[in-house]
Amino acid sequence: MFIIKKKYYLYIENTSDINLKCIKKSKKIFIIYRNKSIKENIDKLYKFRKLCAERGFKFYIANDLRLLKACKGDGLYLSSFNKKISLDKRINLIGSAHCFKEINEKIKQGCKTILLSRLFKTDYANKKDFFGLIKFNLIIKNYKISIIPLGGIRASNLNKLNLVNSSGLALLSETKKKPAIASRLF
C-alpha cells in the first residue's frame, strides 16, 4: 500500500475523527470538515484549525461560509447539492460532483478542484453506480481543472489508485472505519 500523489483529501465529521499527531507534517493534506448533524463548538474548531496549520494541513469547511470565517479556514468545500453561483472569488473552493452536469456547475462556481464521486463500487444500498478506472481517466481528460477521485476507496484497492491519472485522492468512510489508514498512507 504505497501511493504517491500530490494531494490527499480527508473528510471528517467531527474533530475527534482523526488524530492529527499520527500523520506526518505535510502540505499535501487537505482536511474537509463536514458536520451535518451536531454543531461543534467554534472555539474547538478554531483550535483544530490551528493544529492543522501547525502541521501544514489545509482546513476546509463544507457549505458554511459563516463557520469558515469564524474559524478562519483555508477554504470552502461545496457539496454537489450546493448550487449557489455567487461566491467570493477570493475564497479557495473545492467542489464535489457525480456527473458531467455537476462538474460544469462547479467550474462555473469557481472551484479550483473537483472531487468526482464513486471511483469504485460502494456498499451503499441506494448508490449502485460507479465510474471505474478507465471511465474516470477518460472523464478527466476532458477538463483542464484538477479532478480527484472519491468513493469506494478502501485498503483493498489502494494500489489501483496508482493507475488513476489524477494528482490526488480523497477518503471519506475509510478514515472513519479505519483511522490508522491515514497514518499508513502518508
Q: For each of these PLM feature ranges, what is it?
A:
Residues 93-122:
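Histidine/lysine/aspartate-rich catalytic loop segments that bind and position anionic ligands
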